[in-house]
């Protein structure tokens, strides 16, 4: 029996990099509400007392960048200088310009279905049967821990919690099946008045125990709750934040490969984002169809070219049919040209701010999580 450990992490919506992601996607959503065909590439930088929003946009829409930024920071929970960041008093700098016409001519076409990819690149999609949402267990539970932290904080149940937090979960695998949790790390920002002992007890009882299944916790499971003992200075005061700096948190926690492209702030003509979503959709439907226990798909594009330059399916020896057969089925059942996948997943909508914290995958509210192709795939595979 082969045994190994695998670890994934997550961060809360109040982490500096995630603040930046959420602001970038708030800007994207506001523009898409007015102009679904807009071209947006929005980058955000946050540091003590300031937010800088930049990038390139092609649209006739007008949005109030300062108001969007302040509202986003306020919703996250940074509303007082005691937290090191305040939505109402921070400086907001706007450095957004226009997208290069050289890119436009490569993307825009007379026939919409001939729309070219907004850039070259490679993207991966992944799914596995080890959780109810067909995602790897380590990143799934890492997300749920920090999401629970935010819920408890916002409800006022633990009024000393602050927005910045991180989690990390190490699972024990036997023959590639999760059988237990070896270690849990949770660090949360807090106000100065709470003691370390109070914090550790409350985090264990109110955050960790309600989230992690008891079947995976043993007497040998190790817990590291605020292991430095103090986390008062956090958020943008503790570290600067940038859009696109949490790409492994955003995807599969390191369990699958990554093409390197970030998601937040990018409209769906950018295949870094839309094709990664399509890849998840493909992989999840293959696993949901029972055609494999684990599935990873790679898709690649050339700028200005509609057809993918490559499609490859890998099932790590768990497939009910060969990977070559699955690759053929993917080509037959999924539209992976940029225009086609945008239509397939209905991506020209303001749905992106919600993706910018707690992972883009494994959350049923998003269209790339549908398993509506599973029956057709299974039938086509003659299973």
Swiss-Prot record:
Catalytic reaction(s) noted: L-methionine + ATP + H2O = S-adenosyl-L-methionine + phosphate + diphosphate
Binding locations of K(+): 43
Region feature Flexible loop, mapped onto this chain: 99-109
Enzyme category, top tier: transferase
One example GO MF annotation: methionine adenosyltransferase activity
Cofactor: Mg(2+); K(+)
Pathway terms, separated by semicolons: Amino-acid biosynthesis; S-adenosyl-L-methionine biosynthesis; S-adenosyl-L-methionine from L-methionine: step 1/1
Name this polypeptide is given: S-adenosylmethionine synthase
UniProt organism field: Pseudoalteromonas atlantica (strain T6c / ATCC BAA-1087)
